Structure formats: structure tokens, C-alpha cells
Amino acid sequence: MVKVYAPASSANMSVGFDVLGAAVTPVDGTLLGDNVTVEAAEQFSLHNLGRFASKLPTAPQENIVYQCWESFCQEIGKTVPVTMTLEKNMPIGSGLGSSACSVVAALVAMNEFCGKPLNETRMLALMGEMEGRISGSIHYDNVAPCYLGGMQLMIEENGIISQQVPGFDEWLWVLAYPGIKVSTAEARAILPAQYRRQDCIAHGRHLAGFIHACYTRQPQLAAKLMKDVIAEPYRTKLLPGFSEARQATMEIGAQACGISGSGPTLFALCDKPDTAQRVADWLGAHYLQNQEGFVHICRLDTAGARVVG
């Protein structure tokens, strides 16, 4: 039996649309992510557990974990009969890499169970393919940090899919999920087909400056450059209360604030625990819309997916 935990992730980070992502873990020890268990069996079966299991497809073939098992078996050239259990702790359509959690946990669990026949690069490529089935396009900004941990920059050249960017230990990520769903496909459809030249220049300046600031250990500069001219101006209309929340968190003292992935989760970056707590309290009182919503104060999850049983 193998049990694998895969952490939540925040893609884009305002400054890196489709090319940056960070794995996150709550500072209070709460597990914000999915678990997948694989056990030997005579034939395949899949069981769903967890807080958000009721939101999953009822037909096993439509479940991404089943599709991961099927693709993994094709990849290694043999059918491996197993019982898989998905513990779905991540809300679907939240902007926290929910589908990536399931994909990464399922594939890592299968790879561990079978004695690691696939290397890291092939695993990551397969994860991107599986993620693409849900979002409509292959992208790695959730699966890469979820799998490898830390802050990841998508490279996709010279056989390299992603590489780690140094983060800052003092950064606290306040993540507020309001409890509503925004589909990745819908959030992508709202974006323009073409961008103005000045926006392209600003985006390049912000992203290059951010990576430079990370490597030269300038946290305040890095946070200041976390601006989004590509997606946020258009996606804000999908997120009730986002503009007000952003203004409030910055006034409280957040270093940066933006949309996590395609939303509706908001992230606010703080460099002091008391600031993070005040931001979390405000978001809990004003940004959450129902009982399914939550706020977590997080740090970077540097471990990524790991075997927990």
C-alpha cells in the first residue's frame, strides 16, 4: 500500500501568467491538498472520500484519478490492477490547483507502487497532459510546484519543463477561498485574443524583475513587481468583492495581493505574522460567501508531493 499527499498550489502569482506557480502549506499544520492511496487488487476500483468528494463525477471513467491510472498503465506498457482511494480535500474550481493535486497524487502513488518506472521529467510531462484534459490546454504552473515543491518557473526548453526559483522564508501567503466556483475554461475564455504593446512590455518588465529580485534576495522589490496586466483586469468581473478585498488587504499592510490561479481564491502576501493574521481576519469576515469558504495563512511548501503511508 502506498499513500501520497499532494499540496495545494497558487499559479500565476500575478506576475507570471501560465509560467509561475508556488506550492503552499498552512502554517498551523492543516493539510491543504489531496491524498491518493494505491493498494494491490485483482481488478481496478476507485473510491472517493474527503470533504469535497460529493463534487466529483459519479462515473469512475470521468474521474481524473481513473484517467491517470489508465494513462500510467499505457505509459509503462502493462495494466496494473489496483484499488485507488482519492481523499478529496480540495475544492474544485477554486484556483488552488485542485485538479493538479489529484493528478499529482495519483501518478506519484502509482509510480511509487510500481517501483518508480518513470523518471521525474516523464512524470511531469504526463501530469501536464492529464491536467490539460480538465483545463483544456497543457500547462504546468500547478502540477510542477505541486509535484516538486517550492516556487517553479516553467521553462519548456532543452528538455527542461520547470526549474525552481528561490522564495523568501519570511513571506506568508494568506489564501482566501470564498466558497464559489470559477472554471478554468471560463476564466480563460474571458481573456482577450490580443494585447496592447505597452501591456506586453510591462508584463515582461515585471516578470524579469521579479525573477531577478528573487535571485538577488530583494523580497520587497519582488513583492512590488507582483502585478498582473494579463489576466486580472479581465477576470475581476468573475470575482465578487475582489477589488474591495484587494484594496483592504493592501491598506492593512499586505505586500502584494492578487488572484490565485484563475480564481476565485485570493492571495495576499505578507512579511509579518501579525499583518497576515489581520489580513486573514478581514478576508474571513468580508470575502467568504458561504460555509465552504476558508482562509489559511501559508508558507511555501518546499517538499511537494510526498509519500505519507
UniProtKB/Swiss-Prot annotation:
Gene3D superfamilies: 3.30.230.10, GHMP kinase, C-terminal domain (3.30.70.890). SUPFAM superfamilies: GHMP Kinase, C-terminal domain (SSF55060), Ribosomal protein S5 domain 2-like (SSF54211). Pathway: Amino-acid biosynthesis; L-threonine biosynthesis; L-threonine from L-aspartate: step 4/5. It is found in: Cytoplasm. GO terms for cellular component: cytoplasm. GO terms for molecular function: ATP binding; homoserine kinase activity. This is Homoserine kinase. It comes from Klebsiella pneumoniae (strain 342).
